[in-house]
């Protein structure tokens, strides 16, 4: 692959060079979970789909940990390279790898020792717990691959290898789809088979990503001599906003499950599983746009080329709005088709699902711009502003509206929580952008 100079290449050309590989690479999370959801909903049924939604939070935390270390470390690496600092790749990559191994072991220990209490806390019931146990059997030993798939992708994008990151996602995703069908239909392996297919796909994904380390243009080197534990705090600080996004999403799913059980029963969680899976696809696209801009923004920030950063910002925001509008329109035009992809519902349940999809999908019109703004602020080393956006849109506003509005207007109010939170956050994002326009101030 041609090795381009991100500080000199025309901005639009550099952005497009990263866009499709970044989008396809970030789709890996949604591919694994989306395929599982469709297969489980159609093959096993609504209760199994509700069980899958219960395990979303820990799975998102695993991927989020990879983003924490990968994006956090690679942003600092790119800024350091823009300033011509020596050994930046070795220092940050080695720190991220060692941290990832340690954190994966901690997660595995917690879920092995405290599995039942954790799942009951997340909302598992007597109806769903057996499905959850079957699904999590392959997931727990596969935790390192959840973390390292997203972590290595981030470093590869910043090492000018977006196509290798894309190849890993495609190979893992396609294999996951094939194995999902084989394990669930001919072999009738149920939830265990769906989960096993996902983990095998992740193993292949990581294996393909690791081929970059043998490439001639690889500058990422693992070296214990360059391990600097003091950098761990810097990596966490840099990557925490994007990690908190995944944490916030996990918490929000948990809160939604509580409210939906209260107002709708188990079918409410099934409907939300349809929405959250489709939302995950949209968010993956938004993250892809943001991550296409991230290495260009960080490298030019380190080099002090601020006009180029503003051009990247405009391209990213416009692209995010277009993607969001497409999802919003789809939610208004074909809500029933979207629901039918995942599971067959009764007439009354489909009525509720259609209303929920139409309301919730209006959030995508604003969500893409907010996610891009959050990642943009992180790329110009303004993690506090990025963190504020994350907390406001992901936990504070959504959580407050989620509990207040249903009490005022009934159960339909649950579905307005995210659209209203995203709309208000857009206004805050505009204010923060105006504050950050003079990025020379640091």
Q: Predicted regions span which residues?
A:
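Residue-level hotspots within pore-lining transmembrane alpha-helices
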Residues: 24, 28, 32, 62-66, ...
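Helix-terminus/linker motif at the lipid-water interface of multi-pass membrane proteins
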Residues: 31-50, 119-126, 182-189, 250-277, ...
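Transmembrane helical elements of multi-pass membrane transporters/channels
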Residues: 17-36, 138, 172, 201-205, ...
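Short runs within selected transmembrane alpha-helices of multi-pass transporters and secretion channels
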Residues: 70, 139-157, 165-173, 194-209, ...
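N-terminal transmembrane alpha-helices
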Residues: 6-44, 60-72, 76, 80, ...
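Small-residue-rich hydrophobic transmembrane alpha-helices
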Residues: 49-109, 146-165, 271-335, 367-389, ...
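Short alpha-helical transmembrane segments in multi-pass integral membrane proteins
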Residues: 1-19, 77-142, 188-240, 297-363, ...
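Structural signal for membrane-spanning alpha-helices in multi-pass inner-membrane proteins
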Residues: 111, 154, 180, 184, ...
